[in-house]
Amino acid sequence: MAKVSLFKQDGSQAGEVTLNDSVFGIEPNESVVFDVVISQRASLRQGTHAHKNRSAVSGGGKKPWRQKGTGRARQGSTRSPQWRGGGTVFGPNPRSYAYKLPQKVRQLALKSVYSTKVTDGKLIAVDTLDFAAPKTAEFAKVISALSIERKVLVVLPNEGNEFAELSARNLENVKVTTANSASVLDIVSADKLLVVQSALTQIEEVLA
């Protein structure tokens, strides 16, 4: 069973946490992680790109010249695609790029990235993150006490940590999520994970 050090908010060590090997100790599947990251990045795309075809371009309702007798090629509109200022053919239309992967694939990717963080020593467990009020300075002290210098993903329990979330919201390189909402993309994008002990239990309940 994998073990990680458990810290208090002030940075002092409070003991160790034993992790479930079926969640935090598997052989990472990099191919599955790649597929899930691509899927989640695709879901973030707005997909609002658009073009104007010949029917959407303003003007062009009048036939530019009569059908026969001019010696020119027949034309029905000055907004045909071959005209300057005409419509676009086969241009982009608004669409959703999102696509879903099977649940087992997504769960395997989560277990893979969690296991990688544990193996690399980049998962920091903290017994609790309790704040009497939303204070950015107080959360900054926690980050400093735990010697976290680069981008960190803070994983809170699913409920009851509103002050912690508000306290971290304005800190640079700090992103906050919950046990059920942590995504593979968020985890691989962060240098370290700061996970509350109760959130670890909730993660194991879902993925084990």
From Swiss-Prot:
GO MF terms, alphabetically ordered: rRNA binding; structural constituent of ribosome
GO cellular component, as recorded: ribonucleoprotein complex; ribosome
Segments crossing the lipid bilayer: none
Residue ranges of the region described as Disordered: 45-89
Entries under InterPro entries matching the protein: Ribosomal_uL4, Ribosomal_uL4-like, Ribosomal_uL4_dom_sf
Record keywords: Ribonucleoprotein, Ribosomal protein, RNA-binding, rRNA-binding
GO BP terms: translation
Quaternary organization: Part of the 50S ribosomal subunit.
Role noted for this protein: One of the primary rRNA binding proteins, this protein initially binds near the 5'-end of the 23S rRNA. It is important during the early stages of 50S assembly. It makes multiple contacts with different domains of the 23S rRNA in the assembled 50S subunit and ribosome. Forms part of the polypeptide exit tunnel.
Family, as annotated: Belongs to the universal ribosomal protein uL4 family.
PANTHER family named in the record: 50S RIBOSOMAL PROTEIN L4, LARGE RIBOSOMAL SUBUNIT PROTEIN UL4M
NCBIfam families: rplD_bact
Name this protein carries in UniProt: Large ribosomal subunit protein uL4
Encoding gene, per UniProt annotation: rplD
